[in-house]
Amino acid sequence: MPGTAKKATARVPVTRERALRAAMAVADAEGLAALTMRRLAQEVGVEAMSLYHHVANKDDILDGMVDLVFTEIELPADGDEWKPAMRARAVSARAALMRHPWAINIMNSRIASGPATLRHHDAVIGCCLQAGMSAAMAGHSFSLIDSYLYGFVMQESALPFDETSDIPQILDEMYEPFPANQYPHLTQFTTEYIMKPGYKYGDEFEWGLDLVLDSLEALPRV
């Protein structure tokens, strides 16, 4: 006799990493405010109470999400030359932060650092120390590079356009209410630079990063 009962749909088991990845997807799409235990439970297909077998609370989720972001950052390896290694690390960190715009506000706020976070910090400090820097100079360098990195990403994320936007059209709309030649220097700047074909604000990052790294490299390492 042919069976008529429907086979039960196999559930994908919930793991800590699956829950954290789902939490990141919610935050990427809608921001941290949208992330609740109930919403996360819906995303992974379980009751909210079942999540507590895998995560302790929302702080634990945020700790885990931050640690996953750090896994996306290219780390200096032992023996790497300082400047290219720190450059590659900063470029990859910017890319990770742009993929996860919620992360910038909490990346360095977590008390319970995860293994990827600690590996990242250890590798960056290690690269500086192996380049002959004192502990103090390593700290200064790390702080300066990350101040530039985080500041640039915050500004880039807040812009009313991205690399896919029609920048000339946006600028026309911005300046339309003002009389012609009211802001001559700004007009010259936008015409001669921003309106040029191929302009991307993101390209400013590597120009500034190289300036920071060149300046640090020229300083005494003690």
Language-model features: locations:
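Alpha-helical structural segments
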Residues: 18-25, 30, 60-76, 85-92, ...
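Amphipathic alpha-helical segments used for helix-helix packing
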Residues: 64-66, 94-116, 122-123, 154-158, ...
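Hydrophobic alpha-helical connector segments
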Residues: 74-119, 135-138, 145
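N-terminal intrinsically disordered/low-complexity leader segments
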Residues: 1-14, 74, 184-193
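Basic, helix-initiating cap at the start of DNA-binding domains
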Residues: 1-39, 43-46, 55-63
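Hydrophobic alpha-helical bundle segments that form small-molecule/ligand-binding pockets
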Residues: 120-144, 148-174, 197-198, 216-220
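A structured, mid-to-C-terminal "fold-capping" secondary-structure block
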Residues: 166-222
